[in-house]
């Protein structure tokens, strides 16, 4: 209690009665939450200019794209013309991408400047490919930089220097934490439309807050929830399995040759790891023509015989062994080798990178995945390609990297892979939950293989326990709490 009093006196924390509970916030979180509430309220109160003739233009878009929107899809596109703030949700196969394409087309035909963004580089790249328009990370869109002396993150785009956009569309919004949402809202000029797209059944953001869920559950923001699975998507066992898990049911585990979903029962951990290695090294590349680089192994945990650490050791030895003229550098328990798939494990705003076209910048972020291109003969400089950016690391910066042949489901959020192998094995109770299994399944685009035991799968599907997030945003929005 004395420690709390000291923090209150110093202004490090803020106490406030929130929904009949005595809340205690870090000051920065309290400021972010109240700011988000204030901006959202302002957007809800502000009636934007109706986009006249929108319905006629939507008809033209349907004809041009050779489609007919389902009723809820059309509702989403029409609401985008009417609302300053719109939420669009839906699971796999429900037509979110088609709806977003329609919203983009409508905005552009009405002469609006539209920006697309997502929380991670992979999610932004995927969004851009699906929408046929460049998408950026939210960090890059806002011009994020880091003050080395104060440790503060700043953004060049803010209230004083807002984004030059009439509309901003955000994908994978469930991953956006409170601080990043605060920064995004601050960068929107008055009247700018904001469309938040995502799947609320995936895991929440790593950082503080549950912004997407709070906005939906406040029932103050116009929301379209796409529910129906389209016939074409319904043919995918991946899509069907995701929706079964979301309903608390176990996926169908009977394998058929024409399926995009397979279950390989393995109870013994040694045999399980051997199976994963065999799938990545030979079976999928040779039988299904899926190269190892397009396969991502996912698991719930880092620890244990079937955690990411053990899987990465086995996969590195099989897919990128020592020798063959590949230089390597040992750091701690890991050996980094030319050709290895690696992942950044923390935000580093100082890492310099360059693209082939000569553009350069700084910053590699938590969860970014790359490939080691070259280790110089001294072992002191390492070149790593993160998609289209090549970054140079010094040897001491290897502390920020981990192997990425296998990764936790949490780290895979916002990404999509041609093939996913999910390791189903006992883990800590907090990880044996439906959200982890659902998120793992929905990372797969063409092929999903579950390897492990059906008991663990059943426990995960049945366990709807969610990580509790203490937040006052829903209360502030829904009950008129003070901002």
For each feature predicted by the language model, list its residue ranges.
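Interdomain "pre-motor" coupling segment immediately N-terminal to P-loop NTPase/helicase cores
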Residues: 1-53
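Long, charged amphipathic helices and adjacent flexible linkers at domain junctions
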Residues: 47-63, 325-332, 465-480
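Conserved pre-motif I regulatory segment
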Residues: 56-85
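Conserved SAM-binding loop
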Residues: 69, 116, 169, 297, ...
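ASCE P-loop NTPase helicase motor core
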Residues: 74-77, 82-256
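Conserved helicase motor core of P-loop NTPases
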Residues: 75, 192, 200-363, 373, ...
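C-terminal accessory regions
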Residues: 247, 355-359, 366-483
